[in-house]
């Protein structure tokens, strides 16, 4: 029997502070719950949306009930007895961090049980010897930033100075990351990518998970904006991924949409599709759901929930994007094939109502749909790896080293 798996990952869509949230300073975080509360109280109204958060298709897959189990309260405005068509769980992260790479790697069988390297100082964040080596090896004349910053704010603050000097802007965050912003036209996209590649080679021994190219355009503070040509340079996963097993044992196709390929350092990816906006990500995903051959795994990361709304602490924007996604989810459901398994999940939280601008340590929703899957609560997962293990079971692959299978189809003992 030919099967397909479709994974839709809503980047940063947490559903309540996890049991270890206190260790991360994230007690009280609840991305979905706090967005729903703001919407219900008309605090997230805008020209684009108003009133309670309306996510009927996500609710039908068990989103609200998953959040109820995770946070002990139903998101405001959600139904306590929706017309349930999916099976649902919620998951605690096993990995030692709350970043994109850790969450994604864990769900494909490679939890991060070591400590990433971090740049913890808010100013003068990077060691001088590292900066000196980057300058020496790349022949840039200097750099700006060298601090923790919001990516959109730092190009407003330093973009004009960057255009005067052509010094790249170096910055970081609470994540294990070294980010480089530069003007796409004046500095040059190829030059930015080459700089990031060199910086990645220098930083890899320090276990810095990612170097990210952040190109932008514009002529002044008011017009600067980031482009869709972001590129992530990531450390390769330390364990064999589900993708690789699927290719080796079933000659499967692994189709990356958005930044998935970069997150996994292109390991086990057979096809890659980029997309710039949330609409484009939905369009490309729907196209692949319609056209990808059997024996495929389609995996999309919907980054904008995190980058445009979570980190920016934009509750109304996050709510509007969720409602747009939910409407497009209807199209995905309508185009699934007989033996498709649909999975919706997240990689961490990024509560737009919470203090600061960083990710939040939260439980994630794990929602499944298949025609032969009984709608039911599947319990609490102690690792995101349960997602990968369930996929391995569904596809008839060798089991992963981590995680347990959550799925029991009609007709199975």
Curated annotation (Swiss-Prot):
Its main location: cytoplasm. Its cofactor is Mn(2+). GO terms for molecular function: magnesium ion binding; manganese ion binding; phosphopentomutase activity. Pathway: Carbohydrate degradation; 2-deoxy-D-ribose 1-phosphate degradation; D-glyceraldehyde 3-phosphate and acetaldehyde from 2-deoxy-alpha-D-ribose 1-phosphate: step 1/2. Gene3D superfamilies: Alkaline Phosphatase, subunit A, Phosphopentomutase. InterPro entries: Alkaline_phosphatase_core_sf, DeoB, Metalloenzyme, Phosphopentomutase_DeoB_cap_sf. Mn(2+) 1 binds at residues 11, 347-348. GO terms for cellular component: cytosol. Signal peptide: none annotated. This is Phosphopentomutase. It comes from Helicobacter pylori (strain ATCC 700392 / 26695) (Campylobacter pylori).
């Amino acid at each position: 029997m030919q099967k397909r798996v479709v994974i839709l990952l809503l980047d940063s869509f947490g559903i309540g502070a996890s049991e270890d949230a206190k260790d991360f300073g994230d007690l009280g975080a609840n991305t979905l719950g706090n967005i729903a509360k703001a919407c219900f109280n008309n605090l997230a109204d805008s020209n684009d949306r108003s009133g309670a958060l309306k996510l009927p298709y996500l609710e039908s897959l068990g989103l609200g009930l998953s959040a109820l189990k995770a946070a002990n309260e139903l998101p405001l405005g959600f139904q306590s007895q929706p017309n349930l068509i999916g099976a649902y769980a919620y998951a605690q992260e096993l990995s030692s961090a709350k970043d994109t790479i850790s969450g994604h790697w864990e769900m494909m069988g490679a939890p991060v049980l070591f400590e990433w390297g971090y740049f913890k100082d808010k100013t003068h964040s990077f060691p001088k010897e590292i900066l000196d080596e980057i300058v020496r090896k790349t022949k840039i004349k200097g750099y700006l930033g060298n601090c923790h910053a919001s990516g959109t704010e730092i190009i407003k603050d330093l973009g004009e100075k960057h255009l005067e000097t052509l010094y790249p802007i170096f910055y970081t965050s609470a994540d294990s990351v070294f980010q480089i912003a530069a003007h796409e036209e004046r500095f040059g996209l190829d030059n930015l990518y080459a700089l990031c590649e060199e910086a990645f080679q220098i930083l890899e021994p320090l276990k810095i998970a990612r170097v990210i190219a952040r190109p932008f355009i514009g002529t002044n503070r008011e017009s600067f904006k980031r482009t869709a040509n972001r590129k992530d340079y990531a450390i390769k996963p330390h364990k064999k991924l589900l993708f690789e097993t699927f290719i080796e044992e079933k000659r499967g196709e692994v189709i990356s949409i958005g930044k998935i390929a970069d997150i996994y350092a292109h390991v086990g990816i057979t096809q890659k599709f980029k997309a710039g906006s949330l609409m484009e990500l939905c369009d490309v995903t729907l196209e692949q759901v319609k056209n990808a051959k059997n024996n495929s795994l389609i995996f999309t990361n919907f980054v904008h929930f995190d980058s445009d709304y979570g980190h920016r602490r934009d509750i109304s924007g996050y709510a509007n994007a969720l409602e747009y996604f939910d409407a497009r989810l209807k199209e995905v459901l309508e185009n699934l094939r007989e033996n498709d398994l649909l999975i919706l999940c997240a990689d961490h939280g990024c509560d737009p109502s919470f203090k600061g601008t960083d990710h939040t340590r939260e439980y994630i929703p794990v929602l499944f749909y298949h025609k032969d899957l009984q709608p039911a609560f599947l319990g609490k997962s102690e690792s995101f790896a349960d997602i990968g293990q369930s996929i391995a079971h569904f596809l008839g692959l060798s089991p992963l080293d981590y995680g347990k299978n959550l799925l029991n189809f009609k007709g199975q003992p």
